[in-house]
Amino acid sequence: SYMLALPDDEAQAPTITVGEANFGLYPMATGQSRLARRFYDEAPALDAVRAKAGLPLDADAAFAVGLVTSNPDDIDWADEVRIAMEERVSMSPDSLTGLEANLRFNGQENMITRIFGRLTAWQNWIFQRPNAVGDKGALKVYGKGDKAQFDWHRV
């Protein structure tokens, strides 16, 4: 996740505020809060975030406690976002479905995460799509040195 740092303009700098709802009011399919999942249930990391509850955190403060993974300033922002978008566009739209499912249903496994996180995305969606198994699909050209041709309109 990216958050813009504006060190020269604190009044305009975006902030993020964590509240009690972030600690379990809306559990994931794993039964964990999203913060617990993000920090792998590690108490020191969760305690550091809880200590900041109710405080507006700028990009540097949010990065320091692990709430964001990147905090580029306004000089680097456009390039960082462009690179992230180019990397994402280079992937098959169907593979992104699988990556999203892996992120949404990660962590402690149970029957719900197995069905909706793995089986549904991979068996019923990704491996049946032309982007994977078509003539120029990723699975057909894998290892041959050819570049897959993706149908971007199927997303």
Listing of model-derived features with the role each one plays in the protein:
Residues 1-89:
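Crotonase-fold acyl-CoA enzyme core
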Residues 48-64, 69-155:
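C-terminal alpha-helix plus adjacent terminal tail
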